Amino acid sequence: MDLIPDLAVETWLLLAVTLV
């Protein structure tokens, strides 16, 4: 589970910003 940590974090951040 260490293939795309940065990508996952960025995706979650974008999702959070979109939701908020």
Swiss-Prot record:
Entry membrane topology: Peripheral membrane protein
Lineage summary: Eukaryota, Metazoa, Chordata, Craniata, Vertebrata
Entry protein name: Cytochrome P450 3A5
GO cellular component labels: endoplasmic reticulum membrane
Obligatory cofactor(s): heme
Keywords: Endoplasmic reticulum, Heme, Iron, Membrane, Metal-binding, Microsome, Monooxygenase, Oxidoreductase
Induction record: By phenobarbital.
Source organism of the structure: Papio sp. (Baboon)
Enzyme class, broadest EC rank: oxidoreductase
Assigned EC number: 1.14.14.1
